[in-house]
Every structure is written in structure tokens, then in C-alpha cells.
Amino acid sequence: MNYYVGIDGGGTSCRARIRNQQGEWVGEAKSGSANIMLGVEVALRSVVDAITQAAEQGGLSPDDFPSMHVGLALAGAEQKEAWHAFMQQAHPFASITLNTDAYGACLGAHLGEEGAIMIAGTGSCGILLKGGKQYVVGGREFPISDQGSGAVMGLRLIQQVLLAQDGIRPHTPLCDVVMNHFNHDIDSIVAWSKTALPRDYGQFSPQIFSHAYCGDPLAIELLKQTAADIEMFLIALHHKGAERICLMGSIAERIQDWLSPPVQQWIVKPQSDAIEGALMFAGKPEHNLYKDGL
């Protein structure tokens, strides 16, 4: 029997879902980061770990991997060099098809029909599928892109907290959260920043939301800025022809109330998720982002 696996991999986690050839659910699991820009070996290891755990739920084992066609919707796959490096790795599966996490999410959100999505989680990216073509805005990775993401919001938070420590801007309760995290040691923040990954900055986003709802001025400022960034991408997608846009990801799903009313009118609920989108192209090499790979 053949099995089909959908993978949704981002900067924070990798989620796997297995279905049999009748489309019946077999198992689902989550592992670590699968952003291929952070290392193709790490990403493949996370993929295999998630599939292994999901397989166990359905009474399967690694012996069944050669019967599995895997659709990979991974962050960072838009980078051609990284895409090729990932695809050149040895793997135990029947086939792998690799496209971006945004592509998988858009397919899932509109069940394969035309439409657009705006993803904002650890990273951010907007994508429109229309007329057989793919249009992308943003998504060029932290720190040079990914506006509207948890990572950029967390970076801005750290910057503002340091300004508050210097007496340049007012200190708020949200500043205390960050300083407590680093044991009130600015040198620790500086040292941490030298190796901090997008998910490390993104870890502060839940606190930003909760403090904004409590009226914290800094948190409100950060959310307004994040909403403006996301709205910028939504307008760009609309100009490219998007009539229906789904908000996806931990930040985007919570930011809708912060968007302007005209923009909110374009928002629709996703019909499914990125894992289902990845399942749609499992075993279908024509969905590979680049066609000259292995």
C-alpha cells in the first residue's frame, strides 16, 4: 500500500500528517524546525522525526518509508541553492516533492482553487495563486524581510526595551517581561542576540499580544506596526489580483481586528491547512518549485 505524507515546516516546528491511498488519516505529529535556510540536514532530520512519530500512531515503522510519497511545504524553499541542497540529500521515501510553506498553505486554504494567503508566524510571506501562476510578496527571511512576523516583532521589542533602559522611551510592564527573561542583564541580551534565531525573537509575541490587551503602550505600538506591515502585503496581493485572502499563522490569525475595515473585507477563512496543501502535491513532481532538481 502507498501512503501520502504532508509536511508543513517552518522556523519553529515541523508538522507531518499521513494518509493512506484511500485518503484515510493514519497519523499526525510535530518535531523541530524545518526551515531549510537554517540547515538542510537539520530540516530533513526534523521531517524524518515528524514522519516517524506520525507513522507510529498508525502502527507503521521506518520499514514503510519506501511506500511513502512526501509533499514538503517548507520555509526557505524559495531559495534555489537551498532547494537543490535539500533535494540532493539521500532519503528513505518513495518520492519527495518540495515547494514553499506558503505554497502549501495557499493550496490548502483554497482547496486547490485560486486565491491568496498571508502567512505571519515566526516568519511572513504572502502568496497568490491565479491563472496558473504564483505571485509572492515578502518572505525573504529574517532579518532583511519577514515584516509582520513574530521574529520581526520580537526584534523590535528588544530594540525598544534597550531604548527604555537608556531612558530614551518610557518603561512599561512589557519591558519588565523582557528584562526578567534576561535576569536584568543588558550584556546577556547582547550576547544572546549574537546567536538568536528567528524563533528566539518570536518567543516574545504571545506576551506582546497579552500586554496589548491590557493597555501596555509599547505592546500596542508594536501590534499597530505589525498590523501595518501585514496590511502592506495584503494591499500588494490585492493589486496583483487577489480577491480572497486567508490569514494564516500565529500572528496573522490574531491581527485581523487591528487591520483597517476596507482591508478586512478581503479576508476569508481558510478551508484547510498547509499540511493538507502539501498532501495535495505529494507524489506529484510537477509541483516542485524548481524543475531541474533530482
Curated annotation (Swiss-Prot):
Thermal dependence of function as given in the entry: Optimum temperature is 40-42 degrees Celsius.
Tagged with keyword Phosphoprotein: no
Family matches, as InterPro entries: ATPase_BadF, ATPase_NBD, Euk-type_GlcNAc_Kinase
Residues reported to bind substrate: D101, G139, R140, E141, D146
Keyword ATP-binding: yes
Record-listed ATP binding positions: T12, T122, G202
Comment on pH dependence: Optimum pH is 7.5-8.5.
Primary location group: cytoplasm
Compartments, as annotated in UniProt: Cytoplasm
EC number assigned by the record: 2.7.1.8
GO molecular function, one term: glucosamine kinase activity
Biological processes annotated in GO: phosphorylation
Catalytic activities: D-glucosamine + ATP = D-glucosamine 6-phosphate + ADP + H(+)
A cellular component term, taken from the record's GO annotations: cytoplasm
Record key words, sorted: ATP-binding, Cytoplasm, Kinase, Nucleotide-binding, Transferase
CDD domains linked to this entry: ASKHA_NBD_GspK-like
Family: Belongs to the eukaryotic-type N-acetylglucosamine kinase family.
Protein name: Glucosamine kinase GspK
